Amino acid sequence: MKLAPYILERLTSVNRTNGTADLLVPLLRELAKGRPVSRTTLAGILDWPAERVAAVLEQATSTEYDKDGNIIGYGLTLRETSYVFEIDDRRLYAWCALDTLIFPALIGRTARVSSHCAATGAPVSLTVSPSEIQAVEPAGMAVSLVLPQEAADVRQSFCCHVHFFASVPTAEDWASKHQGLEGLAIVSVHEAFGLGQEFNRHLLQTMSSRTP
């Protein structure tokens, strides 16, 4: 996948730019418990002052909140989407196909993922552990990727275009009708998982380099 290095660099750059790199993993692990996360809880876990948490969240404009101002979604969400992400008998959701391949390694849990082909509506499913994917149905499942934009709203600029497809040919036919998307690429689900693993390594290295 020739675009992989560029997609990876853009993804990591977006996280650096909006300041979410250090916040992402603790937030995901709290959301994975299946309940809203207060800013106070997040500040305590990160050992950050409340003002720093507020400043980072202000930059991450895609963040979802409940009516009380608690966080209910950032990549992993309590609100229903097309990407079902089940862990420990809890039904959660993700913003896009790539999220479902990235998050198990970051939260240290195996997830059962189910969705639909973005072109045909056919069901797709797989099991994603921190280190591998299994039970891929259909076996030829594919994923669409685009170059992430340098924008605060990563959900709108990237996630909304990253889908599962029942097969590579089906995805390529869909892509032929969406050529206006910058850097649009179709890859196998295994290639997408590999990209996600590489993103995780970059993210965790960034976090460890900032740890006193």
From Swiss-Prot:
Keyword Transferase: no
EC number, UniProt record: 4.99.1.2
Coiled-coil boundaries: none
Matches recorded under InterPro entries: MerB (IPR004927), MerB_HTH_dom (IPR024259), MerB_lyase_sf (IPR053717), WH_DNA-bd_sf (IPR036390)
Keyword Lyase: yes
Molecular function GO terms recorded: alkylmercury lyase activity
Disulfide topology: none
Catalytic activities: an alkylmercury + H(+) = an alkane + Hg(2+)
Source species, domain of life: Bacteria
Alphabetical keyword list: Lyase, Mercuric resistance, Mercury, Plasmid, Transposable element
GO biological process: response to mercury ion
Role noted for this protein: Cleaves the carbon-mercury bond of organomercurials such as phenylmercuric acetate. One product is Hg(2+), which is subsequently detoxified by the mercuric reductase.
UniProt similarity note: Belongs to the MerB family.
Protein's name according to its UniProt entry: Alkylmercury lyase
Protein species of origin: Rhizobium meliloti
Gene encoding the protein: merB
